[in-house]
């Protein structure tokens, strides 16, 4: 039986492997050109090309201008492609009075798997009290929240929230941005049962996956690609070709997300 890296090297399907992309985006975005617009149809085509089972997306318009409209668009996508596209409920802490009502609209929809906040776009640090209504409700319901973090310091700044709201499963995105200080990442993630990271990153350094796995519990690492901001082939390839055991790759590529999101 060929190893995962051998299949990828020769352009063969990675058969019998569950691949779940836990961090993606859909729709137009104002800050850079996306020739295929990140439509749900395009994303499913990309999943099919790579043998990916499903992905969990957030609507770009939800961060930039209109979270209510963005969530409606996401609901349409998950209804059109059940089992292939799942969604995050996109929230904006600037509109803190709307957050709980937005969660309630979609929390019982099986197509939605959690909540997404984007700190860089919404310019609201994790210590802000504006997050509290959503955090308190999500903690009561035991929900999962994907938080945009960029660098080890940003990741570490999420730790107090994870300590306070222990029923929330927090995912810190783009964990390899802080790979130059892997001990700092590991200290936060490995000591908290409710803290995870993902691999979404467009320009990772060579060896960053191996370094992440060396320091961070691989059961806490989720496969994410930023589809369709960027081509998912890059992150898929660097995980499949990484110098780590195939069992670890299987956990990162899909088994960890399957457990966390009950997919």
Pin down the residues of each PLM region.
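Histidine-centered divalent metal-coordination motifs
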Residues: 23-29, 148, 174
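Active-site gating/metal-coordination segments in enzymes
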Residues: 53-54, 62-144, 191
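Mid-to-C-terminal alpha-helical segments outside catalytic/metal-binding sites
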Residues: 1-22, 37-54, 218-220, 233-263
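Catalytic pocket-lining loop regions of alpha/beta-barrel enzymes
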Residues: 110-114, 124-222
